[in-house]
Every structure is written in structure tokens, then in C-alpha cells.
Amino acid sequence: MSNERTAQQSDIKQLISKGLEQGYLTYAEVNDHLPEDLVDPDQIEDIIGMINGMGIEVHEVAPDAETLLLNEGNTGNREVDDTAAEEAAAALSALDTEAGRTTDPVRMYMREMGTVELLTREGEIAIAKRIEEGLSEVQAALGVFPLSTELLLSEYELHKEGKRRLTEVVVGFNDLIEEDNSVTSSVDVTDESIVEVDEEDDDSVGNDEDAPTIGPDPAEVASRIESLSTEYAKFKKLYAKHGPEHKAVIKVREDVAAIFVTFKLSLPLTDLLVQQLQNMVNSVKDHERKVLHLATNVAKMPRKDFIRSWENNQTNLEWVEDAIKRKQKWSSALRDIKDQITAEQQASIDLEKANSLTLADIKEINRMMVYGEAKASKAKKEMVEANLRLVISIAKKYTNRGLQFLDLIQEGNIGLMKAVCKFEHRRGFKFSTYATWWIRQAITRSIADQARTIRIPVHMIETINKLNRISRQMLQQFGREATPEELAKEMDMPEDKIRKVMKIAKEPISMETPIGDDEDSHLGDFIEDPNVESPVDTTTNVNLSETVREVLAGLTPREAKVLRMRFGIDMNTDHTLEEVGKQFDVTRERIRQIEAKALRKLRHPSRSEQLRSFLDID
């Protein structure tokens, strides 16, 4: 590849040198020196623009001598600068190469991915610590928000009622991480051994939440929840007595937050707490926006005046009166909407009471949370981008299984992002070791869910994979395909279930699949159409019709016509006794007698023998 690019640069250098010497180039000459795979008109225009920028004109055909003489002042004194030509050739070559590489989305993705440097073990730990710090700042902000404590206590109550698993509420303790690390480090497990186990179980497909998680000690959780509940009750009591800004209230609120941050909350619960705070902040901002609209758009109060006077007065119900007393030109209009503004302020006061915080505190808590989230998100992004190559290397092993390579990469990236969220650097393993499990889990699950035209449940995919693996082993062992009985014995499963699994495991095949060496016929041509009558049935029906007509010919014309009408032979439909009686102008009873007599004649062996062979014995 390097030699090819060097040769390309040499050709372009000669082209530029030629253009500098003669002062012009033709489109044909430029086209001859461009790569064959460069077909994008925009890229070609950019290249010609760069050539024009060097003072070389590009023409459809070579200009005549008179035109060259007219331009002699511009071209005759031009010197050929080899260095400039080399630099220009390198730039154009790079542009060409870039253009050729941007047509394939996989190449584009890999080129962009390759610009990010790989992380060392120390780099992984540094990013993991930044993620941890950001999440800690988020939880610290949530801890100061009283409704977060209320929600945590209510979720724990649901756990006590059996409606929540403990790990759906609390997954550990932040202040015991160091102790957990010391315990983990004493276990003699290496990254390689984990990877080996993963390789052996490559065909298994499980739930994304099947990752082994060791829950916290229930007794310890109960003890800490009890302490949190006690402190929170004390906070509510003091708040009701003194309000949000009293020193004792602030002190107890900090004590509640100190206990709150010791819990390592589950990701769904953390998201719920964050959403709760964001909704509250949005409500506060919504009321302020309405007041801003009323004051500036309706009353025409200058925006600067509003902002200056509104600050620290969001819940001051006297603010409107004070603004009106300033006797500005907008004061009368402000008086007309006084009740509306006061209503919005009262709603903000109600929010303060509901949250046990001032509006300023709510905004500050939100600012802390947003800052922590941004810090964690930035670090997660860096960790993900630095490990995209790992996803590529794993996804390559799962090609030709029903999903496109880009789809495999996408699913693997989703698993990588989950791994980043759940990674704990203190356990001593490299991130790549931990992420491999999540990436494979995401890819294998997506293959199980999406690869087949007819979806098969994931648990059945596991059984099919196990069956295929054992079948291959027995084929190598015995030199033949294993029978269902042998597979049932090997897998310790009922034989009928093995047969069902083998039937389900069949892959769909296209009806356009060529058949034979000439490939002039397709599989669909040999599939029986159940809606079309077979030739045997057609022949049988024709013979039956002829035989019935012959038998009826042996009866009297009246008897034959009665039977034809009663059974619809050679007619559109059959007829009732009354309908046949009207046709012959006789009673129903007479028609019944004629019919019975005719059938007795047909049952005679001389006539019935001809029809008996058509009876379907089966």
C-alpha cells in the first residue's frame, strides 16, 4: 500500500511539474494521473481547484500558440520548485486516498476509530476514577434533595413487602469499596482464566442482567436504612418548626445526605432519582418563564429591569406591588396581571414546601448534579472510544451468522457501553477482560433475536447451540451423524424433545435456490402446491363422472332425472323433494318413492360393482 501511494505521488509530481513548465494542463492529462476509483465529481473539482491555486490553468484542449503568447507574462518567468511540487503531490495524493476510502462506511468507521489511542492499565484506572467521581458528585447532589431520601425509603419498603429485590434498590456500599477490594485481591484469579471460561461457553446466550452480582448484606442495609429514616424524620420535624434556612435544619439535612451517599444505588433507581430532580427543576423554571412572559411580553416591562428586580424575589409576594409603585410606563399593565404573577409565585412557594428546600437550593443541587453527570459522561465516552477496537475483534468471530458486520459492531458497542457503566476498577481486572463478556453477551443475544427469519426464543437457541456442539463432537467420534436416541442419551433429554429441537433448528431456504448443474430450475418448481388438484385425483374424478352417467343411463329417464336433481349431478346444485316435485308436478312423497326405487336399482350388484371401486377405503 505504501509503494502504491509513493508511485501515485510520483505521477502527480510529474503532472504538476509539467503544468508549471508549460503553464497549463488539459483535463485529459489530469484524469490520466488520478486514481481509477476516484469518481466523486466534488472531489475532482477540489483537486482541479488546488491545481488552479498553483497558477496552473486547466483547459478542455491545449491552448493555441497565440493564447500562450498573450499569457507569456504570467507563464514565461515561472520557475519549477521541486519542493512545492512534492508538497502539492503529497496533498493531492492524500486527498485522492481520502476520497477513495470514504465510500465504504466500514472503512470510514474504522478510520475514525483508529484516531483514538489505546489505553494503558493506568489510563483505564484514571478514566474509571473520573467516572466514579462524577457519579459520586451526582449522588452527593441527590443526597441533599429530601425527596430522593423519601423515594429510597419507599423503594426499600417495597422490598420488605416482597415487591422488589434488594439489588433493585441497593447494590452495595460506597464506604466499603476498599474492604471489598482487599477481599477480591486475595482471590487468585487471572484475566486469562476468565477469558478461557468465556471462550468455552461461547455459544451460550443469556439475559443481559445475568451478570453475576453479589448483593449487599441485608442486615447491614436494614441497619443503615433505619439510621437514614431516623435522621430524615428528625429533619422533617425541624423543618416544620424552623423552615429551610435554620442552622439546625441545614445540619440535620447534611447528616441525612452523609448517610444517603454511603449507599451504592442500582442504576435504575439512580436514573429515577435524577429524573425526579429534573422534573422538579423544570417545574420551577416553568413558573419563572411564565412570570417572565407576563412581565416582559404582556406588561412590556424591560427585560433588564425584570431580571435585576426579580433576582432573589421569586417567592416574594410583594414584588409586584413594589414594581407597580415605581410608577413606570408599564406599571398600569403590570397591575392588570398582578393576580396571574402572584399565582405563579404562590405555585413556587408550594414547590419549596413540597421539597423542603428553597428555590435557590433546588437550582444549586441541580447544577451540582448536571456537572457530575457531564463529568461522568465525558469519561465514559473516552472509555468507550478507546475500546472500539475490542468490539471489532470480537464481532469478527460472529460473521456469517445472519447479521451484517455493521449490525454486529453496533450491538457490540451497546454491550461495551453497559460494561463501562458497570466496570469496577478496584476489583483488579483489566477493563478489556470485563468488557469482553458484555460485548459477547450483546452480540450473541442480538443474533438469537434478529438473525433468523422466524424468531426462536433465546432459551431454545441455547439448546440448539448445545445440540449442534454435541452433534459435531459425536460426528468426529463415530464418523457419522448421531441419531436422536444417541443425542437424547448424551444430553440427558427426552427423545421427543430432541426431535422437536432438531425440527426447530432447520434454517429457512430460499425458493429461488438453483437446482442442478445447469441452474435453469429452482427449488420452488419442485414444491407441491396443495391448492392444485393432483393429476391422479383429476383422472379419478373424470372416470367417476363417466361411470355415474353410464349407471344412470340404465334407469328410466324419470328416475335418472330425479337422482340428478336430488344429488346435483351435472347441475349447479342439488334440489329438495319439494323442488323436484314442482318440476314433475307431483307430491314430495311421490318423488321420495321414485328416489328410493332408483337407489334400490343402483344397489343391485350388476350396477353397484362399477361404482364400488371408487370408494375411498382409507
Swiss-Prot record:
Keywords, sorted A to Z: Cytoplasm, DNA-binding, Sigma factor, Transcription, Transcription regulation
Compositionally biased intervals (Acidic residues): 197-211
Function, in words: Sigma factors are initiation factors that promote the attachment of RNA polymerase to specific initiation sites and are then released. This sigma factor is the primary sigma factor during exponential growth.
Region (Sigma-70 factor domain-4): 551-604
Organism: Xylella fastidiosa (strain 9a5c)
Protein name, entry field: RNA polymerase sigma factor RpoD
Region (Sigma-70 factor domain-3): 462-538
Superkingdom to which the source organism belongs: Bacteria
Locus of motif Interaction with polymerase core subunit RpoC: 407-410
GO biological process, one term: DNA-templated transcription initiation
Region called Sigma-70 factor domain-2, residue ranges: 383-453
SUPFAM superfamilies cross-referenced by the UniProt entry: Sigma2 domain of RNA polymerase sigma factors, Sigma3 and sigma4 domains of RNA polymerase sigma factors
Pfam family, one: Sigma70_r3
DNA-binding region of this protein: 577-596
Entry keyword annotation includes Zinc: no
GO annotations of cellular component type: cytoplasm
Subunit field text: Interacts transiently with the RNA polymerase catalytic core.
Matches recorded under Gene3D superfamilies: RNA Polymerase Primary Sigma Factor, Sigma-70 factor, region 1.1, Winged helix-like DNA-binding domain superfamily/Winged helix DNA-binding domain
Compartment(s) where it occurs, according to its Swiss-Prot or TrEMBL record: Cytoplasm
Annotated family: Belongs to the sigma-70 factor family. RpoD/SigA subfamily.
Stretches for region Disordered: 197-217
InterPro entries named in the record: RNA_pol_sigma-70_dom (IPR014284), RNA_pol_sigma70 (IPR000943), RNA_pol_sigma70_r1_2 (IPR009042), RNA_pol_sigma70_r2 (IPR007627), RNA_pol_sigma70_r3 (IPR007624), RNA_pol_sigma70_r4 (IPR007630), RNA_pol_sigma_70_non-ess (IPR007631), RNA_pol_sigma_70_r1_1 (IPR007127)
Keyword DNA-binding: yes
GO MF: DNA binding; sigma factor activity
